[in-house]
């Protein structure tokens, strides 16, 4: 995770000697030698070059993962199998890609509107983390396919308004009225800041559940 490509500015970072094969006296001649890969998800044996490529694709691209400090071996193995099995990439068809694109665009437009329309108001923007919206919806859809009927969400301030609007289907009009202090209920006994308010909705998944 220390070498994962997660810096959008691409700033240079010092190398880690222990991640260089030469640190273990391995040379270019060793790259095509075949090794047992019992501790890596996938084929039972691979060349050193394939092992390095697979681990790099899994742990050193745009997703960084730090989990080896966990005490529970079964949890570590569970994570390892699921990440290394697909190299931390899921295959999305064009329909899914377009859906994610629309969700992220909607999330970004929502944040931009609030920032421009309610200048100076605290909103704990989701800006920079818009991928949370398709991720949460994907989790809910997956749950629906596993016969889960109820989902209860509890989250911190950051991104909460966006989740209320784009996941919980809370009316943006209602959210904006709350920002403008036009909702009379906010002044009758239960007043609270906008990013503390919740919502309940009936979510219909793609499978109709």
Model-flagged regions — what are they?
Residues 97-111, 132-145, 186-205:
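Structured alpha-helical segments in the cores of large, soluble enzyme domains
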Residues 47, 51, 96, 100, ...:
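Generic hydrophobic, aliphatic-rich segments that mediate packing or membrane embedding
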Residues 4, 8, 21-22, 107-108, ...:
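A sequence-composition feature that detects small, non-aromatic residues
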Residues 113-173:
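Active-site pocket-lining segments that scaffold enzyme catalytic pockets across diverse folds
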Residues 152-209:
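Cofactor-binding active-site loop characterized by glycine-rich and histidine/acidic residues
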Residues 1-132, 148, 185:
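Extended, charge-enriched "interface" segments that sit outside catalytic cores
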């Amino acid at each position: 995770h220390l070498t994962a490509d997660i810096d959008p500015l691409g700033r240079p970072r010092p190398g880690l000697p222990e991640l260089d094969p030469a640190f273990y006296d391995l040379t270019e001649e060793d790259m095509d030698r075949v090794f047992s890969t019992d501790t890596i998800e996938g084929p039972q044996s691979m060349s050193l070059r394939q092992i390095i490529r697979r681990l790099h694709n899994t742990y050193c691209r745009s997703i960084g993962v730090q989990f080896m400090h966990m005490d529970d071996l079964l949890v570590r193995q569970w994570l390892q199998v699921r990440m290394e099995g697909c190299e931390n990439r899921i295959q999305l068809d064009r329909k899914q890609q377009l859906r994610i694109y629309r969700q992220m665009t909607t999330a970004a437009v929502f944040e931009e509107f609030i920032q421009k329309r309610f200048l100076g108001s605290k909103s704990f923007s989701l800006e920079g983390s818009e991928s949370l919206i398709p991720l949460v919806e994907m989790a809910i859809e997956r749950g629906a396919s596993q016969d889960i009927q109820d989902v209860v969400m509890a989250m911190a301030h950051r991104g909460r308004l966006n989740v209320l609007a784009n996941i919980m289907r809370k009316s943006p009009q209602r959210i904006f009225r709350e920002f403008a202090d036009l909702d009379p209920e906010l002044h009758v006994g239960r007043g609270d800041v906008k990013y503390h308010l919740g919502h309940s909705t009936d979510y219909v998944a793609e499978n109709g559940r």
